[in-house]
Amino acid sequence: MATAIQPDRGCLFYLMGPSGAGKDTLLDACRGQEVSGRHLRIAPRYITRRAGSGGEDHIALTPAVFRVRVDNGDFALHWRANGRCYGIGVEVDRWLANGDPVLVNGSRAHLDEALTQYGDSLVPIMVCVDFDRQRQRLLDRGRETIEEIDARIARSRRLQARLEHRFATIHNDGSLTHATRQLLAIIDHH
C-alpha cells in the first residue's frame, strides 16, 4: 500500500494594523493571487457588526451567535477589539495542513495568543499609515463617530510604537500597487 505524501504545512500570514491602514484593500488586491505556485487563501472574518456597514467585507454575526460559534469551536482565532467580537474560521487550519499560504486580517492586541497557537507557522506583517491619513480614511468611510475615531487613533499610537519594528512592515501611504507588491513579496519569501 502506497503512503500519501504529506504537503509541507502552509504559513499563516497575520496582517495587522490600525483601522484605516488599508488592510481590507490590500486583502482584496491579493484575492486570486498565486504565491510560489500555490493559491493564496484569504480567510473571511466573522464580526459582530452588521453587514454592509462600510469597509471590510465580513460575515456578520450577532453577539449571541458569535458566542455559540466560540463554544462550538468554530473559530481558529477569536478576539475582542473596538467594542466588537472578531473570529477567523477553523477552515484556515485545513488550508494550512494542505500546504496553502493563508492570509488573515488579524489583531495587534491578539498577536501573542496567535503566535502561541501557530508558532513558526505564523508570519506577522504590520501595515502602517500616517496618523493624519488614517484619520481621513476613517472619516471618509463614515462608520465611526469622531470619538470612536479619536479612540482608534490613540490605540494605533500605543500599539504601533510597541510593534512596528518587530515584524515585516508595509507603509501604506502610497499607491495600492506598491503596497500590494510589498505584501506579496513578503509572502513569496516564506
Predicted stretch roles:
Residues 32-42:
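Post-Walker A helix-loop "phosphate-sensing" segment adjacent to the P-loop in P-loop NTPases
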